Regions:
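Phosphate-group recognition and catalysis centered on beta-loop-alpha active-site segments
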Residues: 1-283
Length: 283
């Protein structure tokens, strides 16, 4: 019985070590608390203006919202703002963003409009000129096959360009490796772990074990995130534990059909899409 108790205790301690968040850093999180942040900029279901376009970011800043956006590399290592791994949903082209160079990528029209995918630097400049106090949540996109060296270069480029932005910003990723790299390269930047429900990971084809690990934040030991960005699904025990331990809770993505008042009450910041909430719901 004593041996069994010791085994259980060790397992519990290992799990706690795996999922534990960073200590609270209230000064860094203050600009985000109570803020509604426009998912990929402020755009409508008709993609007018298109998501992750300069007009969508300018509209969000003009309306006083925070902004969530996505960054990744082109094949020639230009840092661009684009959500999907592939081009076919938002442009006439096909293939992966990381396999196309900037010249070809920048020529692609977004959602049949006259807008084109922007460089991250141009996005930052546009927002700074519109409202320099706009809080930014920057998601660094990743794929399982990306090497440590590639991710380090991607994070380094993102951090370097953010230094020119005058307003508050933080970095998040679904990939715990990215959060860990940000922790090492720029420990003073607020960092967050994105996570989805176990059911969503399984639906997307993720095997059961990694789906459980990702949804239950077992990668937190790499990045010790300041915040958890969680989906509308019910919080599992690991997410609840992080909230109890003081991690800032960010909700993605609130839609018009959700109980948005409830989501605002339960979260420190909300990433929204396709409706017009108040700029801030909590002071």
């Amino acid at each position: 019985m004593k041996i069994l108790f010791c085994i259980v205790l060790i397992l519990v301690l290992l799990v706690l070590f795996a999922v534990w968040p960073n200590k609270r850093r209230d000064a860094l999180r203050a600009p985000f608390v109570g803020h509604n942040c426009a998912h990929r900029g402020y755009f409508g279901k008709d993609q007018r203006p298109p998501e992750n376009s300069l007009p969508a970011f300018a509209a969000a800043a003009q309306n006083g919202y925070g902004i969530e956006l996505d960054v990744q590399f082109t094949s020639d290592r230009r840092l661009v703002v684009f959500h999907d791994d592939t081009l076919d949903r938002m442009t006439p082209a096909k293939g992966f963003v990381h396999n196309m160079d900037w010249a070809d990528f920048s020529a692609q029209p977004l959602a049949g409009s006259n807008e084109h995918p922007p460089l991250f630097a141009d996005m930052l400049r546009t927002v700074a000129e519109t409202n320099p106090d706009t809080p930014l949540i920057v998601e660094i996109k990743s794929r399982a096959e990306y090497s440590k060296t590639y991710l380090e270069e991607l994070c380094r480029a993102t951090i370097a360009e953010l230094k020119a932005y005058p307003g508050p910003y933080c970095i998040e990723s679904f990939d715990p490796r990215v959060v860990g790299i940000v922790r090492r390269q720029a420990p003073d930047i607020l960092r967050g772990q994105l996570a989805d429900s176990y059911q969503s990971y399984r639906k997307d084809g993720t095997h059961a074990v990694p789906a459980f690990a990702f949804s239950h934040l077992f990668g937190n030991f790499l990045g010790r995130p300041d915040f958890i960005a969680w989906c509308p699904a019910k919080r599992n025990w690991a997410v609840k534990l992080n909230a109890a331990l003081g991690a800032m809770m960010v909700m993605w993505t609130a839609l018009p059909e959700h109980d948005t008042a409830k989501l605002e009450a339960e979260n420190d910041a909300v990433i929204f899409q396709w409706y017009a909430p108040k700029q801030k719901y909590r002071e």
